[in-house]
Structures are given as structure tokens and as C-alpha cells.
């Protein structure tokens, strides 16, 4: 299993930090009006409708269209990262500014915040997953890839270094 050390200086934000607020975290949760737990495989960042959404990593656009599973207008960027294939996913966009096959650099404009798909208001749903052919995708907490945001709830967050495990 590889352990990656990410320095705070390497973080980028898909939405400017002074604009976005994390409203839902990675992990198990109970949705309003429901009784069963569901896994939330990303983070939700509330932001004004139309705010720019930017890539956090360089890579190739492998999906830029409407997602039929609830993500609305969505962009996937596939990158090589620490010997793994990593996908960063940006969902519920109001507009997509890239096309499938394009190569993007970190901080490239991908689209704008929206409320498309299964959404309760303008926000960005941001996911990270490791592609594992024949084994299924492995979702990772995307907070290790972004700079700090304001939060609805105080949770521990490491400012100077973050460790994540990628692999089995």
C-alpha cells in the first residue's frame, strides 16, 4: 500500500476559498427525511450559482456531459498520480467549459456551479477516485486534495501535511 504525503502548498481549490463553504462531507450520512445511512463519496461545496469551477490537478477530460445517475452536468479529469490513475469529478454544474479529450492544467476553468441533477441548491459535488481495473473504483476523501474551506461543522483538519492511503 502506498502512503502519499501531500503538502499544503500543493493544494488547489475547485472554487475560491472565500466563496465556497463545505456543507456535506465524505463518509456515511443520513439524508434529511430518511432513516437509513448512505455513503457520500465526495464533498459538497456551497457556492453562488455561476461561480467558476477549476481543476485541482492536470489531466485529461474523460467525461464532460450530463450524468444520468444524478450528477447533472459533470466533468471527470483523469490524471496519473503517484503511480495510480486518479479521477477528480465535478458534478451539478450549470455549464461545462471543456470537451472530452482535452488536456487541462491545474486551475483550468471546467465550468460553473449549478444545481443540475439530484441537487438541493447551487453547489459543487467534488469526488476523487482511484481507477482499479477489474477491482472496481476506490473512492478517496477529496479533502486531502483541496485547500481548507469554511465549514458548517468543525472537524479535524491538518494544515501542514496530510496522509492518504491509495491501494488495497
Ranges and model annotations:
Residues 97-98, 109, 115-122:
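Short glycine/proline-centered loop/turn elements that form peptide/ligand docking sites
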Residues 51, 84-86, 134-138:
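Short acidic/polar mixed-charge low-complexity motifs
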Residues 25-27, 80, 93, 145:
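Generic beta-structure capping elements
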Residues 1-3:
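Positively charged n-region of N-terminal signal peptides that target proteins for export
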Residues 6-73, 106, 115, 119, ...:
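Surface-exposed, glycine-biased beta-strand/turn segments
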Residues 129-155:
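Short peripheral tails and domain-boundary helices/loops at the edges of structured domains
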Residues 38-40, 55-97, 122-130:
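Zn2+-dependent peptidoglycan hydrolase active-site motif and core
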